[in-house]
């Protein structure tokens, strides 16, 4: 009497899921290769339907490779697996990660650099103020969702609803404000506090951090925004006393009421210095 023992064929189940939520994913194009690089099987993942491969060789190493990731995901690194000698179903899981957004704002403004005396003849004094562009610190922004920011798996709860506040950022000593690890999507930014001496930029700015492709792990928005400095305009209307008759030929002088300094704290114009002067001055306080 001779007994023949029959080996059961190996069975492997392969699933594709979201690394964070564990939800199984549709649309991933996958390939299994043997150790020589030959294609053993190819298919497209279907949600809640693990792909089954039978009769792989026990003890041989195989490679599960993602050729195309589902929309909204990054392509996963290869997964290597070896089949054991068992009739039980062996499971292999490949997890996909989602890209994240990085918002970087470089805030600039004009700073007084130097003052040049243009003319000093025939009683006339005039100065030229020259400015340089530099970084603005302590400028604060609120970041909002410009649309419903949805989870890539299509099942999990939305990250943010339209117009929901995402967070607040403030520029550092280098004029940089940034927010990272944002879910892919569209946002807008509002300036809520600006640096001393500058005009608040009240217009919302829109930022597109939408999904790019399966090979871009960080979607970056990096832009320079500039604030206008506050400016002063002086207009003098000379009238005759007790009447509204406008008088021509009035002569005025404009003086500093405090030391004028540059961004480094260096005094460029001392207090009570004439900025604009044509003969007899009438002092104006600004």
Regions found by a protein language model. Give the residues of each.
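Solvent-exposed loop/turn and edge beta-strand elements of beta-rich ligand-binding domains
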Residues: 1-279, 283-285
